């Protein structure tokens, strides 16, 4: 029997499809989401409905985003869900989540078993709509969750860690083995909850500047900051900001990156 076929659907590699089948894990995720009627609940990648069904039982209506037309068509005729669902057959990377929140007149509660092949770019896309989202609960590759929660000084700490922790409180929920899926992925998974801050602990005046310096620093993570960020500020500037110019990207905290971004933004304004 082909292990890529589940409930009559052939799992498509190009969409990174692995279907969750473990009832204990499903129940744990639904309890951590704790959906309530009337909330603006959005599921990304409902697949065959492993999470959609138990969440849908608690909701009067919900929205799902599904790129696979065959899976979207199955949901359209689902016996218990079809009258509750708004199905957006579209790539989640192209969705304006702020517009969805505006249409629903409240912040969104987003969840899903995210395709591992797009999980990191999708996280960055969602962070850009953090003000329109009340919380996010995702199944991700365990390695990605480790990066989301990593502290500065660790090898897993990177640009994703900085941007996630700038925008959100990040809470790991549960680890999930490959045997919980069909077909079984080659990696371990984990569930994480991200709660966008209503007031950022370290506000920045220009998020594009924070994005720029973290990209520049972590794209050359083996270099010292004196070299990776040397085109933006001098070693003396770094010392004035209490940052060691001989340190590497992973040794700088979220707060310090925010401080550098704000300083560079203010320098830019003065130059203008």
From Swiss-Prot:
Q: Name one GO cellular component term.
A: cytosol
Q: What are the protein's UniProt keywords?
A: Cytoplasm, Methyltransferase, RNA-binding, rRNA processing, S-adenosyl-L-methionine, Transferase
Positions with a binding annotation for S-adenosyl-L-methionine: 18, 20, 45, 66, 91, 113
A single MF term (Gene Ontology): 16S rRNA (adenine(1518)-N(6)/adenine(1519)-N(6))-dimethyltransferase activity
Q: Which domain of life is it from?
A: Bacteria
Similarity section = Belongs to the class I-like SAM-binding methyltransferase superfamily. rRNA adenine N(6)-methyltransferase family. RsmA subfamily.
Q: What does this protein do?
A: Specifically dimethylates two adjacent adenosines (A1518 and A1519) in the loop of a conserved hairpin near the 3'-end of 16S rRNA in the 30S particle. May play a critical role in biogenesis of 30S subunits.
Q: Mind telling me what this protein is named?
A: Ribosomal RNA small subunit methyltransferase A
């Amino acid at each position: 029997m082909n292990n890529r076929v589940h409930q009559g659907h052939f799992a498509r590699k190009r969409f990174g499809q692995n279907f969750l089948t473990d009832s204990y894990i499903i129940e744990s995720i639904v309890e951590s989401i704790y959906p309530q009627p009337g909330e603006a609940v959005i599921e990304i990648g409902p697949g065959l409905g492993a999470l959609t069904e138990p969440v849908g039982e608690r909701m009067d209506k919900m929205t799902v985003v599904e790129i696979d037309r065959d899976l979207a068509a199955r949901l359209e005729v689902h016996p218990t869900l079809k009258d509750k669902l708004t199905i957006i057959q579209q790539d989640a990377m192209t969705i304006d989540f702020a517009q969805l929140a505006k249409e629903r007149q409240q912040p969104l509660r987003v969840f899903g078993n995210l395709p591992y092949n797009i999980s990191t770019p999708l996280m960055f896309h969602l962070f850009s709509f953090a003000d329109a989202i009340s919380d996010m609960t995702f199944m991700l590759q365990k390695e990605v969750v480790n990066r989301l929660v990593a502290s500065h000084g660790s090898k897993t700490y990177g640009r994703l860690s900085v941007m996630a922790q700038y925008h959100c409180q990040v809470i790991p929920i549960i680890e999930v083995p490959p045997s919980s899926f069909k077909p079984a992925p080659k990696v371990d998974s984990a569930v994480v909850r991200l709660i966008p801050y209503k007031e950022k602990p370290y506000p920045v005046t220009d998020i594009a500047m924070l994005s720029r310096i973290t990209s520049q620093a972590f794209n050359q993570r083996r270099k010292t900051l004196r070299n990776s960020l040397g085109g933006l500020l001098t070693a003396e500037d770094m010392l004035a900001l209490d940052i060691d110019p001989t340190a590497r990207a992973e040794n700088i905290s979220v707060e310090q990156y925010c401080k550098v971004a704000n300083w560079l933004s203010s320098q830019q304004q003065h130059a203008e």
